[in-house]
């Protein structure tokens, strides 16, 4: 058996299936397209679901891919086992209603036995217990002995997700030899006690459709979906025990060892840390390359978790400063040949990682300060267990790993309520699941899938109206033969000039007419190859088979075309001004406005926005020709066309070229010359998520309307201030300065009043164990004023515990403060204010030195303050 490298195996697999008539597709982005059920692509099949369900037409009925994937459910086991990883590559061959078991099984055997040359006497297969067809093919056609074909139950060898397409599967195993076994007499396929038999290729035969009653119906055109883990087959081919010893991954592992000056294999704990970093940095690199940025939600949170976990393990190796960004060089060196995009984006990836590492270092320092407060509180209370909720807050808010919290607490003889921590963690998982709408619509049959193979020919690139035939009518989610005036309908035509919503561009509106019939079309969408014209029958009767004329609203189409070409100019200008790391992550192209979302790690400055706007307008005034061509996908990319990572492309693509300035793959409608755009005006720039920015802009007459509105506002402001336009800003600045001066005067007076009031309150203080205790209500003070008064009292009394209350907008306000020596004697204002606020039907808390809170019941303030004195007395006498 030849020791093939990962890159060699990947290429051999893809080339083999190309020789069997498969179209090789590049790996899809880790960001799922139009699939809310997935946070990240986690299998080779995941990005191909629309093809399996008929929602979209595949570029070929036979496809082969090597798909990069991310899975994190077992993240805590990564580094501790031989095979667990969050990032992996999945080799696959797929058939969309073309070939089936008779081809898939022999081809799989041919590849493993003849191309990879695995020893056939060490290969085993499993099949679904009722799949006699698969048994016959393995036994009679392939020639595998019956004793090496293992029948297994539904749990192991039948693939299904709820309702929809499903079917049996067959898995191929490699026997690593008796020395890897557990030695038990019944050791075999599926043994839980050893890793002797390794499954490396799963062939799924999607031949049934499961209905809601649990019945299985044979699909007229069954599919093939296979998946082989590249790292796993590489480990087998290279005769190594873990994926971290495989050639490509080992290169990254050794780079980390050298960086940390730690020899791998000498220290079990350090080896775990090296493996964790080796795994995580691969996923981190590809996630950022695919446009994901660290955040506190969704896939951004997954990325942040991987980054911080890897950084934490670096700390355990003595790498205290930012280092992960350096490891990207090794990832690019080892994976760049297969994924050239990470070579292009290397500098951007490193910049994002370094920024996040530096931010994490800051939050770790903040977390340490808060943890020390928790330790002081526990010692003051004589407790030795930290609440799980507090440990979780350190993890969730400050990215503080649980093991680091444990380690620091142990030094003070304190442990963590781990059950409480797990409860908080589970609550967060529940919140995350509920916030992400489960959407299995890709697997569900909709009304349009019942219409068979009818399709619509789109002619809207060439004409604004066309004759057509009505193929289907849908009303109230039911297929009908006809509709009449007043009915809301969805109509499918055989030919249409209506652009269907896609690529961010809104669908066309217009009318469908025949002699006495008029349908007002408000929108057009696409399901598979069917264009759905959504609207209302204004007059007459429309029936299936009718000959009609479809006309779009030309003025709206031209508006959308202006805005779509403008987004291409904007995309290019953003890259020129901000950097090549900018990638489009979403857009809206309407007839009256445009919106463009893009990856960038900070707000765009006013100066940068000005440059971007000027650059776009320069290209408009240069009157650049806009040319649309159809090209081969690979050729278009070689010529420099920009492809969006969230889109799927077929072999033939539509290329929109704006002279020599911009070239993008795009299916939208465009102007023929940039001069038709007229003018481009940015109206806003904002954040839409971590690392994602949004620009909204106007073109043409809409931009002129906007500028006129701004001029009217400026005129009104000028008139109000009694100043000329050029003097407006300085006049406002003078007014602002005057206002600040008055506010300072007011604050000074408040401080003087507080100082006078403090003398009165000091007279009311009681002394407990040498500490002056004050609990008093003052009227018309907000929270900040209460804190100021509390600081004055602390300064004057030197040794004090102060609880102050006031009211604001129908709620009670409480502030508690204690001097350092009072805290050392046992005073804990966090506990005092928490109980005080609860009496006033509210919530509060904080640190031992300072706490605050509110209450809903103002009438309970007196009772709450009396209770506060009791609590402080108890703390001091404890």
Curated annotation (Swiss-Prot):
Q: Enumerate the cofactors the protein uses.
A: Zn(2+)
A Gene Ontology term for the protein's cellular component: cytosol
Keywords (A to Z) from UniProt: Aminoacyl-tRNA synthetase, ATP-binding, Cytoplasm, Ligase, Metal-binding, Nucleotide-binding, Protein biosynthesis, RNA-binding, tRNA-binding, Zinc
Give an example GO biological process. alanyl-tRNA aminoacylation
Where does this one sit in the cell? Cytoplasm
Question: For this protein, what is any one GO molecular function term?
Answer: zinc ion binding
Top EC group: ligase
Q: Looking at the record's lineage, which domain of life comes first?
A: Bacteria
Q: Where does Zn(2+) bind?
A: 564, 568, 666, 670
PROSITE patterns in the record: AA_TRNA_LIGASE_II_ALA (PS50860)
Q: What does the entry note on its domains? A: Consists of three domains; the N-terminal catalytic domain, the editing domain and the C-terminal C-Ala domain. The editing domain removes incorrectly charged amino acids, while the C-Ala domain, along with tRNA(Ala), serves as a bridge to cooperatively bring together the editing and aminoacylation centers thus stimulating deacylation of misacylated tRNAs.
Q: What does this protein do?
A: Catalyzes the attachment of alanine to tRNA(Ala) in a two-step reaction: alanine is first activated by ATP to form Ala-AMP and then transferred to the acceptor end of tRNA(Ala). Also edits incorrectly charged Ser-tRNA(Ala) and Gly-tRNA(Ala) via its editing domain.
Protein name, as recorded: Alanine--tRNA ligase
Q: Which organism is it from?
A: Caldanaerobacter subterraneus subsp. tengcongensis (strain DSM 15242 / JCM 11007 / NBRC 100824 / MB4) (Thermoanaerobacter tengcongensis)
For this protein's source organism, the top of the classification is: Bacteria, Bacillati, Bacillota, Clostridia, Thermoanaerobacterales
Gene expressing this chain: alaS
């Amino acid at each position: 058996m030849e020791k093939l490298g990962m890159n060699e195996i990947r290429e051999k697999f893809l080339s083999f299936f190309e020789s069997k008539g498969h179209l090789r597709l590049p790996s899809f982005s880790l960001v799922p397209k139009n699939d809310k059920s997935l946070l990240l692509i986690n299998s080779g099949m995941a990005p191909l679901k629309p093809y399996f369900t008929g929602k979209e037409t595949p570029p070929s009925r036979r496809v082969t891919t090597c798909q990069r994937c991310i899975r994190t459910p077992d993240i805590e086991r990564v580094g501790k086992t031989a095979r667990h990883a969050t990032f992996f590559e999945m080799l696959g061959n797929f058939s969309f209603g073309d070939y089936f078991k008779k081809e898939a099984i022999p081809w799989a055997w041919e590849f493993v036995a003849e191309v990879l040359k695995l020893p056939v006497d060490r290969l085993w297969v499993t099949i679904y217990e009722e799949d006699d067809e698969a048994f016959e093919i393995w036994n009679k056609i392939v020639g595998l002995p019956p004793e090496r074909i293992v029948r297994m139950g539904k749990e192991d060898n039948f693939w299904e997700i709820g309702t929809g397409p499903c079917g049996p599967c067959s898995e191929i195993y490699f026997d690593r030899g008796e020395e890897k076994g557990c030695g038990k007499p019944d050791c075999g396929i599926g043994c839980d006690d050893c890793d002797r038999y390794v499954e490396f290729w799963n062939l799924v035969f999607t031949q049934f459709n499961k209905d809601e009653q649990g019945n299985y119906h044979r699909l007229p055109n069954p599919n093939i979906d296979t998946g082989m883990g590249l790292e796993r087959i590489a480990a087998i081919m290279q005769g190594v025990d873990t994926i971290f010893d495989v050639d490509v991954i080992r290169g990254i592992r050794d780079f980390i060892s050298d960086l940390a000056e730690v020899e791998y294999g000498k220290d079990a704990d350090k080896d775990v840390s090296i493996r964790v970093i080796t795994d995580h940095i691969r996923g981190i690199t590809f996630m950022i390359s695919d446009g994901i940025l660290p955040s506190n939600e969704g896939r951004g949170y997954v990325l942040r978790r991987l980054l911080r976990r890897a950084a934490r393990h670096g700390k355990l190796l003595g790498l205290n400063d930012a280092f992960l960004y350096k490891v990207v060089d090794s990832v690019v060196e080892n994976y760049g040949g297969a994924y050239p995009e990470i070579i292009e984006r290397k500098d951007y990836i490193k910049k994002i990682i370094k920024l996040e590492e530096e931010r994490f270092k800051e939050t770790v320092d903040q977390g340490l300060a808060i943890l020390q407060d928790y330790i002081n509180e526990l010692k003051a209370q004589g407790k030795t267990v930290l609440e799980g909720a507090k440990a979780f807050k350190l993890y969730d808010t400050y990215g503080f790993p649980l093991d680091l919290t444990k380690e620091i607490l142990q030094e003070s003889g304190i442990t963590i309520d781990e059950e409480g921590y797990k409860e908080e963690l589970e609550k967060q998982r529940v919140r995350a699941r509920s916030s992400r709408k489960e959407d299995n619509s890709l697997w569900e049959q909709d009304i349009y899938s019942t219409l068979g193979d009818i399709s619509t020919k789109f002619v809207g690139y060439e004409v604004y109206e066309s004759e057509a035939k009505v193929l289907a009518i849908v009303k109230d989610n039911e297929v009908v033969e006809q509709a009449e005036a007043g009915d809301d309908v969805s109509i499918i035509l055989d030919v249409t000039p209506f652009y269907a919503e896609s690529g961010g561009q809104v669908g066309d509106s217009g009318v469908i007419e025949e002699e006495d019939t008029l349908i007002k079309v408000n929108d057009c969408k696409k399901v598979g190859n069917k264009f759905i014209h959504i609207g209302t029958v204004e007059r007459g009767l429309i029936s299936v088979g009718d000959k009609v004329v479809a006309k779009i609203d030309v003025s709206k189409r031209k508006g959308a075309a202006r805005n779509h070409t403008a987004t291409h100019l904007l995309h290019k200008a953003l890259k020129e001004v901000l950097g090549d790391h900018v990638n489009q992550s979403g857009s809206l192209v309407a007839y009256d406005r445009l919106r463009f979302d893009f990856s960038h790690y900070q707000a765009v400055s006013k100066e940068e926005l000005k440059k971007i706007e000027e650059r776009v307008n320069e290209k408009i005034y240069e009157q650049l020709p806009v040319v649309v061509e159809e090209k081969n996908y690979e050729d278009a990319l070689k010529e420099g066309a920009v492809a969006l990572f969230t889109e799927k492309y077929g072999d033939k693509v539509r290329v929109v070229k704006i002279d020599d300035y911009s070239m993008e793959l795009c299916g939208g409608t465009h102007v023929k010359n940039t001069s038709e755009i007229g003018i481009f005006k940015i109206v806003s720039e904002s954040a839409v998520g971590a690392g994602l920015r949004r620009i909204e802009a106007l073109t043409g007459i809409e931009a002129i309307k906007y500028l006129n509105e701004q001029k009217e506002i400026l005129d009104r402001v000028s008139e109000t201030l009694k100043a000329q336009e050029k003097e407006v800003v300085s006049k406002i600045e003078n007014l602002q300065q005057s206002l600040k001066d008055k506010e300072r005067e007011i604050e000074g007076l408040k401080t003087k009043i507080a100082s006078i009031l403090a003398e009165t309150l000091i007279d009311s203080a009681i002394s407990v164990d040498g500490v002056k205790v004050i609990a008093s209500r003052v009227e018309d003070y907000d929270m900040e004023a209460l804190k100021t008064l509390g600081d004055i009292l602390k300064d004057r009394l030197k040794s004090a515990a102060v609880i102050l209350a006031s009211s604001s907008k129908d709620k009670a306000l409480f502030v508690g403060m204690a001097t350092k020596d009072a805290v050392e004697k046992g005073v804990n204002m966090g506990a005092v204010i928490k109980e005080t606020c609860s009496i006033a039907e509210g919530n509060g808390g904080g640190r031992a030195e300072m706490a605050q809170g509110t209450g809903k019941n103002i009438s309970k303030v007196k009772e709450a303050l009396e209770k506060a004195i009791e609590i402080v007395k108890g703390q001091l006498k404890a």
